[in-house]
Amino acid sequence: MNKNNSENTIIIGGGLSGLTLAYLLSKKNCNTTILEASSRLGGRIQTIKGNLGTPLELGATWFSELHPNLLNLLDELGLKKYPQFSKGKSFFQTKSFEPPQEFFVSESESPSYRIAGGTFQLIDTLAQKIPKEYIKLSTKVTAITESENELQVETSNGEVLKASKVILCLPPQLVSQIIFNPALPENISSILPTVQTWMAGSIKFVLEYKKPFWRENGYSGMLYSHSGIVPEMYDHSNYEEDKFGFTGFLNGGAVSYSLEVRKELVLRQLSELFGSEILNFISYTDKIWTDEFILNGNQIIQRPHQNNGHILLQKSYMNDRLFFSGTENSTQYGGYMEGAIISAKNIADKF
């Protein structure tokens, strides 16, 4: 495929929606090129390997039977799912001066699931369906210009690519970094900065262990807390149940602490609940997602949950050549992996 071919479709953003869209269009024999500003694919899906090889999720993790498009895609790609472990006693902390409460979570008829091997298996498998030369990492789009019968896409490295259609598969708040010529209509350009970006305010942590001592002691690993740095935590053992750990979220105030202070506060809170065995961890990592969403050199503004799936995000622009896709644009399950896939399918259906 010639990169200057005006029949080429350019997808801006190599997250789940962009990769799913490229995969769906490849089945229609449509030429696509993915431009990703980051040095990695996946967007808000990021699985790392711990020191013992444990797949640890710093981004999107869970889904359910209510997400049929994701389930169908996993089946189509030959990927396995498994239920989130929840057997045993769980902790609930109300106030710091009150003892924690223990409770049991009943086995759910519709449990949360995870992807065997880590959520990035989905990203990696989709990427393998696309020729490597048509995935450009560390390529930030700076401008999109409409010319006769095509769009010209300029990148930060000075490259200019031509396309018959361009799909913006990135959070709407980040679209304002792109210069459009002619400018987008005022109604859509005023909406874009107000759309909430999912996970932009999240801080996620993972801990890796040699053995699941909490399970051996009758605990699920689940924690809900109104005190301490960790408001929410879950068992994070792998599909084969031979690698073990925890994953959870840190409260918003943790963003002002150093990594070492965050780790110390996490371990202090958890040791009060699980005992000294919590200190025998193999690795600790956390991810401040606000660091991923940089707009004009600053972190994006945290928005309330608003304007996801807005009607103006469903329309096309620049003479039916420019489209929006992504989980924020989905009219269903916005913020979930399911929403990203639904949005991609809706765009693919227009080709």
Regions found by a protein language model. Give the residues of each.
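N-terminal Rossmann-like FAD-binding beta1-loop-alpha1 element of flavoenzymes
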Residues: E7-I34
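Core beta-strand elements of the Rossmann-like FAD/NAD(P) dinucleotide-binding domain
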Residues: N5-E7, S156-K165
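A short alpha-helix-loop-beta-strand transition element characteristic
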Residues: P55, L70-F91, F213-Y219
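Flavin (primarily FAD) binding-site architecture
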Residues: L168-N187
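Conserved flavin/dinucleotide-binding core of flavoenzymes
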Residues: N8, T20, E102, E150, ...
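Short beta-strand to alpha-helix junction loop
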Residues: T61-P68, E107-A127, E260
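A conserved short coil-to-beta-strand element within the FAD-binding core of flavoproteins
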Residues: L137-L151
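Glycine-rich FAD pyrophosphate-binding loop
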Residues: S26-N51
